[in-house]
Amino acid sequence: MHLIVASRSDPASVRMLDYLTEKYTFSEKGGVLNHGDFDLVIIEDRHIFHDMSLSGKYDYLVVLSRHSSAADVKSLTAHPTGNFGPSADLGGKPRTINISCPRVMSGTLRRMMESYSGSRFEVTFEATHHGPIFDIPNYYVEIGTTENEWNDPEALSTTVDSVMNPDVRDYDAFVGVGGGHYAPKIKEYFRENSVNIGHIISKHDHDALEPWEIDMAVKRTPGCKGFIMDRKGTRGNVREMVKKYADENSLELITI
């Protein structure tokens, strides 16, 4: 079973929830709303601060969310959760990441890329960031960045339908390293090659990154076979840490 989480404190999440329940029939089952293999939970508070313990109940969960961008990037995104480095201003804990969901998160983004044919939105990964704390594999799906986008019918159908029908493929999973928040080179490599992506360590987290956090990213990317590294978008100290870790653990290192 899978779990979808929506928040009434998030206007985009509310619109995604409305689309979800209008298109797909959910009925109460065991105290939660259910449609096939999906349960649905609606919370009142902000999801990034809503820690949940669900071990043994679901194989993964996905949170429906708005995306905020100071640069007003209009986007449809999927990303893992947690915090690399010492800050946890948006939920979770410092230097703590959740278990990523490479097969399903990648399958969701793959479906979004396949189904969206417009030019208004960028369909992309985001690097690992923000809370909350979960104890099962999880990912976020987001619409950015203003009310106009949160109400866009094509944005709603692309994101929600892709959550319900991800294009899941049994490809090897990799940790992404480098690039900015949207990891553009990693996204393009993903688009053109047979891989799944788990955690992504943005260059913005590289200055304070500890070597053991690389180990954590691998161990919290199920089935991880190695790294896909944006060489120019990775700081020199992190390039060396990743190379050393890959060599010592017989992991693949793909440099792009």
UniProtKB/Swiss-Prot annotation:
MF terms in GO: D-aminoacyl-tRNA deacylase activity; zinc ion binding
EC code: 3.1.1.96
Cofactor (UniProt): Zn(2+)
Domain of life (superkingdom): Archaea
Pfam assignment, any one: tRNA_deacylase
InterPro entries: Deacylase_DtdA_archaea (IPR018033), DtdA (IPR007508)
Coiled-coil residues: none
Class in the EC hierarchy, top level: hydrolase
Biological process, per Gene Ontology: D-amino acid catabolic process
Keywords tagged on the record: Hydrolase, Metal-binding, Zinc
Catalytic activity line of the entry: a D-aminoacyl-tRNA + H2O = a tRNA + a D-alpha-amino acid + H(+); glycyl-tRNA(Ala) + H2O = tRNA(Ala) + glycine + H(+)
Quaternary state and interactors: Monomer.
Role according to the record: D-aminoacyl-tRNA deacylase with broad substrate specificity. By recycling D-aminoacyl-tRNA to D-amino acids and free tRNA molecules, this enzyme counteracts the toxicity associated with the formation of D-aminoacyl-tRNA entities in vivo.
Similarity section: Belongs to the DtdA deacylase family.
Cross-referenced NCBIfam families: PRK03995.1-4
Protein name: D-aminoacyl-tRNA deacylase
Organism: Thermoplasma acidophilum (strain ATCC 25905 / DSM 1728 / JCM 9062 / NBRC 15155 / AMRC-C165)
Organism placement in taxonomy: Archaea, Methanobacteriati, Thermoplasmatota, Thermoplasmata, Thermoplasmatales
